[in-house]
Amino acid sequence: MSLTETIEKKLIEAFHPERLEVINESHQHTGHQPGFDGTGESHMRVRIVSSAFAGMSRVARHRAINDLLKPELDAGLHALAVEPAAPGEPTRW
């Protein structure tokens, strides 16, 4: 299972999102550091809408997602951009 698929699965199981996008942005970081050739899964963006985030602060939402994905971050996921929202909240995507 790819890292993208693993992240999607974990987010679905934990937050039951109404909308979810997991985007591999690694290609945008080619050459930024040794070993970043743009072909891996080092930089990911998560866009998620879930009722689980209702009443949570932005920081708490980020913390919940980062805590869930800590094993992936510890295993080499270099960057994780998170765009969480509750249903009915405006998004830029």
Curated annotation (Swiss-Prot):
Disulfide bonds: none annotated. This is Uncharacterized protein in cobS 5'region. Gene3D superfamilies: BolA-like. SUPFAM superfamilies: BolA-like (SSF82657). It comes from Sinorhizobium sp. GO terms for biological process: iron-sulfur cluster assembly. Signal peptide: none annotated. PANTHER family: BOLA-LIKE PROTEIN 1, PTHR46230. Pfam families: BolA (PF01722). InterPro entries: BolA, BolA-like_sf. Belongs to the BolA/IbaG family. It comes from the Bacteria.
